[in-house]
Amino acid sequence: AASSFSSCLDEEPLYSQNNTVVFSSDSGAELALLGCYAYMTSTSAYGQHFQEIPVSGAGFSWSQRNGSDGIVSLQSLSSDGLISTTWNGMYKVISETNAFLENLDASGLSAETKNQFGGEAKFLRALAYYNLVSLWGDVPLKTVASTSEGISMPRTPKEQVLGQVVQDLNDALTIKETSDAGRINSWAVKAFLGKVYYKMVKLGINTNENLKNAKDMFDAVYNKHVYELEKNFADLFGDWVTTSKESIF
């Protein structure tokens, strides 16, 4: 007679790092969130290429293969390596935060955890979209995890994209303070929200209202005295420096 050993099999391979396992605990979800932070510090984002674009555009960089010529002459193409990798780098952050937020929302974690981790992820998504709008204007807007059907999307008007940025940042205002200097906090959210409002003023979007909004946010941060200038400017550039009282994020 045939024997069945189905009862001996693991139906849920708990050693496998799938979404169900990762988002079953605060520590697992936090590791996934730190992965989103890591993509923002990658070579194709703040780790190198995003920083190189304004430097190259100002004429302060040099490439043996004339790699910066297009940017310096303000005639860069989408095929330029620095341009394409920066675009892809920011959308990688967006893709990962979209997936993170969907899995976090579907998890059984506490409302407090969802608010904290979700707020941090939304800040990262907002930052990525702000950078994209600053460089390219109208860009595709995606707030859900990527699927094969959604790979190719038309550009979304920058006004709508910035509206999503403001919404994400407002959602992030309620996050708690953290002792980790590399993590976002509510004061950094307010500072950046003020910057976004002022960007909208410069673009002619609800000028009077957004000018007041920007001032309110900047005043709140300034009056709290959370940040201040370094007494010695050179201290910002030492190879031992990992953070600074000037650093907002």
Task: Give names to the regions the model predicted.
Residues 4-54, 89, 99, 159, ...:
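Acidic, glycine-rich segments characteristic of secretory precursors and extracytoplasmic regions
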Residues 30, 34, 38-40, 66-136, ...:
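Conserved, well-structured interaction surfaces
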Residues 17-19, 75-78, 143-150:
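Short linear capping/connector segments at secondary-structure termini
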Residues 23-26, 127-128, 232-240:
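Intrinsically disordered, low-complexity boundary segments flanking structured domains
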Residues 2-5, 129:
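Bacterial Sec-type N-terminal signal peptides, specifically the leucine/valine-rich hydrophobic h-region
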Residues 148-157, 220-228:
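Short, mixed-charge aromatic SLiMs
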Residues 22, 140, 152:
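Conserved beta-strand positions that form and line the central face of beta-propeller blades
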Residues 8-13, 45-74, 98-102, 134-140, ...:
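Aromatic-residue-lined binding/catalytic grooves and analogous aromatic/hydrophobic interfacial grooves
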